[in-house]
A protein has these predicted regions:
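Short beta-strand/loop segment at the start of cytosolic alpha/beta domains
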Residues: 1-14
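Amphipathic alpha-helical interaction surfaces in cytosolic regulatory modules
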Residues: 18-86
């Protein structure tokens, strides 16, 4: 399975729901989606079940740029925290 992106504009910004897997090859398209979104961005990871290290580093960068990450699985959240502390 590849990455599916569902984008929803809302009053206070944009919610981008990600479904499937996030790999290095997906990051270019995902970055483009973020650049085309409203200033307040939420990434919904509820349906993400697999990521690679490049995806984790991307998510660390997103949080540093004030992108909110919702519905993140525990293993992804812990990996983000470990990567951030490096």
């Amino acid at each position: 399975m590849t990455l599916k992106i569902e984008k929803r504009a809302e009053k206070l910004g944009t919610t981008i729901k990600l479904i499937g897997q996030i790999h290095q090859d997906d990051l270019g398209g995902l970055k483009a989606e973020l650049q085309q979104s409203e200033p307040t961005i939420v990434l919904d990871l509820e349906e993400i079940f697999l990521v690679d290290v490049d995806a984790i580093r991307f998510l660390v960068e997103c949080e540093a740029q004030q992108v909110k990450i919702n519905n993140c699985s525990l293993y992804i959240r812990e990996w983000i925290q470990r990567e951030r502390s490096r």
